[in-house]
Amino acid sequence: MKKITLIALVIFILFTGCKKNTSTVSQIPDEVQAIIQRSCASNEVLLRQLAEDPSLKSRMDEIESFTRRTIASVETRRLVNGVIEIPVVVNLIYRTAEENISDAQIQSQIDVMNADFNAANRDVRQVPSLFTASIGSTGLKFVLIKINRRATDVVSWGTNDAMKFTRRGGIDATDPPHNLNMWVCNLGQYLGYSYYPGIRDAIDGVVILYSAFGSRAIYRNGTYLNKYDLGRTVDHEVGHWMNLHHIWGDDGGSCNGSDLVDDTPNQGAENYGCPSFPHISCSNNGDMSMNYMDYTDDACMYMFSKGQAQRMLAVFAPGGPRALIGQ
């Protein structure tokens, strides 16, 4: 997708935010609003942090400049025995037995990420021939090092980061400069949200709806939300945590936005459900709707691009915003 500056992207997000699509259905617990289309709150929480922390924008601009320099110099990899290990801490906050998902369901999410971020998922074979040469692999290995659990009376946490603080009924992050912290809880209308690199340590990490965490294909006896039961919501949000933007550039269909990646096609807007290929927008040869950074159902997203892989790896390079992860 054509490049624009991070400044322009943030300015556009200030006017568009992150789309939500929800409706109530009686077939699932009352406290989980039926999510008929994927939604994330990453841009919404970014806007709030930009308003609360005037220095964040300059830090993000510096990170973007570093990312471009690092990719251009082909110095994106910080490999140890061929991989970069990402220690993962899962902070599970639950009110009901249903929300208190099992260790096996949690491990299934780690297994999904280790496949998906390395193009080792079986469904990557479904990528259209137009994009097969663009399939990206990162060399990342996610390692579950700790599960923290806490019971709560809170019905739904929302996006105000309260779940990230013990004093507010949540769980404090575990050594965030060195670990990927994930908070799993009831988020109501949202599947999840995440922060881009540059945010303050105390709130850095990924937040996921408990029933969108893990994979039914790996562990069938878990608590899952239909259409979002293969672990791809976490792929999407961890992509944000590694500095990826939505593939359509959050431009509301104008074809003027960008995800700041060269090998993803210009795309007019987000895709939902399981669109038939090609879905053409912005005079492209077909949207890369199967990309994890789109909004399709879990079963219909199964790739990152090579350019996205480079962008993610850049955050771990020496001097990068996540260079201390795993160190």
Residue ranges and their predicted role:
Residues 14-17:
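C-terminal motif of bacterial Sec signal peptides marking the signal peptidase cleavage site
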Residues 111-273:
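Metzincin-family zinc-dependent endopeptidase catalytic domain
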Residues 97-100, 224-229, 296-303:
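Active-site rim elements
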Residues 2-9:
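Sec-dependent signal peptide recognition
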Residues 90-94, 212, 297:
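Short, histidine-centered active-site or binding-site loop motifs used for metal coordination
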Residues 23-26, 264-327:
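Metalloprotease/metallohydrolase-associated module, dominated by Zn2+-dependent proteases
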Residues 102-109, 230-234, 305-311:
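Stable alpha-helical elements in mature extracytoplasmic
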Residues 24-176, 321:
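Propeptide-to-catalytic entry region of secreted or membrane-anchored zinc metalloproteases
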